[in-house]
C-alpha cells in the first residue's frame, strides 16, 4: 500500500529519484542555489521534515554536517509505483498457475465487487469475471480470504497446470489485456522522447523541465500501476514495459545531471 501523499509531495519524491547519476537510493543536498531549492523555495525544509517523519527519506548518518538525505527503501518503492519492476520481472516462477474461483450469491454484490477489485489491484488476470489467475503463490490470499466465513461452495483456491495443450503464452494473452498495457507504455515512451537536454540557464528552462517531469511521472505511474509485472519468462514478446523501464533509467539519469547545471538568475 502506497503512503498517502499529495501530488506536490509525490512530485518532490520523484525529483529525488533522479537528482543524482544512479537510480538506486540517491542522495541530494539541500544547497541554497540547488534546483530543488528553487523548485520548492521556502517550502523545501517543510517537505524534508514531513517526508522524514513518513520514513520516505532518511538522514545520511555519515554526513558530518547532518545536511545529507537520501530516499529510503520505502521512499524509492513509493516513487516507482509501489513495486520494484526489476524485482518483479526477475522473480522465479515454478510453472504453476494459481487460480481463484468464486461464486458469490447475487444478493452479495458489494462483496463480489470488493473481491474483484482486490484481485485486480493485486495484478491478477481474469479468464472470466469469477475465474482469476496469477503466477504467484496465494499465501496472502489464503490468510485474507480463507480466514473469513467463505465456504468451499463460494470460493476455491487452486494450483494448476494446463492439461489440454494450452501454452503459458496463450494463458497470459487470455488473462491480461497487453494491448492496453502497451498503449500506456507507448505514451510514456513518447513523453520520454520529448525530454530536452541542455543546461538550465534560466527559470524558463527550469520550469519547462518541471512540467516535463510531472508529465513523465504521471505517465509512468499510469502504466506501471496497471501492469501485472509478470515474470520475464512469460511476458509477451512485444511487451513494452521492459524497454520503457530501460529508457526511463537512461533519460532520468541524464536529466539528473541536467539538474546540476541549474543557474538561478
Language model region names:
Residues 101:
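Short hydrophobic beta-strand that contains or immediately precedes a catalytic carboxylate
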Residues 1-91, 109-110, 121, 135-139, ...:
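Long, contiguous binding/interaction regions
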Residues 89-96, 104-106, 115, 122-133, ...:
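Basic nucleic-acid-binding interfaces
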Amino acid at each position: 500500500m502506497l503512503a498517502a501523499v499529495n501530488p506536490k509531495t509525490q512530485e518532490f519524491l520523484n525529483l529525488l529519484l533522479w537528482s543524482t547519476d544512479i537510480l538506486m537510493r540517491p542522495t541530494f543536498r539541500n544547497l541554497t542555489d540547488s534546483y530543488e531549492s528553487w523548485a520548492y523555495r521556502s517550502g523545501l525544509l517543510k517537505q524534508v521534515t514531513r517526508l522524514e517523519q513518513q520514513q520516505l527519506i532518511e538522514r545520511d548518518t555519515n554526513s558530518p554536517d547532518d545536511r545529507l538525505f537520501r530516499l529510503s527503501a520505502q521512499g524509492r518503492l513509493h516513487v516507482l509505483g509501489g513495486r520494484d519492476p526489476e524485482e518483479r520481472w526477475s522473480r522465479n516462477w515454478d510453472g504453476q498457475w494459481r487460480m481463484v474461483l468464486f461464486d458469490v450469491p447475487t444478493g452479495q454484490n458489494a462483496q463480489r465487487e470488493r473481491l474483484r477489485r482486490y484481485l485486480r489491484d493485486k495484478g491478477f488476470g481474469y479468464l472470466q469475471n469469477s475465474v482469476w489467475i496469477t503466477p504467484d503463490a496465494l499465501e496472502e490470499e489464503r490468510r485474507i480470504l480463507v480466514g473469513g466465513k467463505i465456504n468451499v461452495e463460494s470460493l476455491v483456491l487452486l494450483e494448476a497446470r494446463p492439461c489440454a495443450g494450452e501454452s503459458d503464452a496463450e494463458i497470459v494473452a487470455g488473462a491480461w489485456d497487453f494491448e492496453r498495457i502497451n498503449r500506456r507504455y507507448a505514451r510514456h515512451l513518447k513523453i520520454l522522447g520529448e525530454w530536452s537536454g541542455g543546461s538550465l540557464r534560466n527559470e524558463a528552462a527550469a520550469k519547462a523541465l518541471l512540467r516535463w517531469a510531472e508529465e513523465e511521472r504521471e505517465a509512468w505511474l499510469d502504466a506501471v500501476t496497471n501492469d501485472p509485472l509478470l515474470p520475464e519468462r512469460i511476458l509477451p514478446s512485444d511487451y513494452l514495459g521492459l524497454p520503457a523501464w530501460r529508457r526511463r533509467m537512461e533519460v532520468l539519469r541524464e536529466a539528473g545531471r541536467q539538474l546540476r547545471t541549474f543557474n538561478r538568475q
